[in-house]
Regions:
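Single conserved hydrophobic/aromatic residue that forms the stacking wall/gate
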Residues: 1-12
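Helix N-cap / beta->alpha transition motif
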Residues: 18-19, 31-33, 62-63, 95-97, ...
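Extended, charge-biased low-complexity segments
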Residues: 22-81, 92
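Acidic, proline/glycine-rich low-complexity IDRs
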Residues: 100, 105-179
Length: 179
């Protein structure tokens, strides 16, 4: 089933797609350029993987006014949607069991969390600790200021990001397929 949450305003047109543990210049992450400005929403498709339990199969973000509905990522439809979307040229590498979409201007920026309560996770800088609190929560996914993140399916590996553009060529929907 798909669960969604609202995300904050997007300030710039570039979205970093990455494991939050990576620095900007690592080879296995990338940016999606020319994203629509405004409020974005995030949704995660969780699937029952038998002995592995319930896992995050797909993390998606959409512009709240124009992006495709989250129903398109439901099990069985995600591959069909991928054919209508553009596969991005970068690999979404994962080494910390999580990946997400982040406003590139605020990626790894501790100041977005300065006014919030301290995170429970104790390793890394303030930004990374807050991100880990989200993926270590019961839902294994959620939103943060200027981003969305989820656990990555079965964990570490390389994954694919797809994007959808509106009639003007502006990105209004993107997703990472983990399973």
């Amino acid at each position: 089933h798909v669960r969604s949450r609202r995300q904050r305003q997007m300030c710039i047109r570039d979205r970093r797609v990455s494991d939050p543990c990576y620095e900007r210049d690592v080879w296995c992450c990338g940016t999606v350029d020319h994203c629509k400005l405004g409020t974005w929403e995030a949704g995660v498709l969780k699937t029952d993987e038998g002995e592995w339990g319930t896992r995050c199969a797909v993390l998606a973000v959409r512009h709240k006014d124009t992006g495709p509905d989250f129903n398109v990522i439901r099990l069985g439809k995600v591959r069909k949607v991928a054919c209508k979307c553009v596969e991005q040229s970068f690999e979404v590498g994962v080494d910390s069991g999580q990946a997400g979409f982040f406003d590139d201007a605020f990626y790894q920026n501790d100041t977005v969390f300065e006014e919030l309560p301290a995170p429970g996770f104790a390793i890394g800088d303030l930004w990374y600790r807050h991100v880990c609190d989200i993926t270590l929560s019961k839902m294994s996914a959620g939103v943060l200021p200027y981003g969305a993140v989820s656990s990555s399916g079965f964990g570490d590996g390389g994954y694919t990001c797809y994007t959808h553009a509106d009639e003007n060529g502006v990105i209004d929907f993107a997703f990472i397929v983990f399973i």
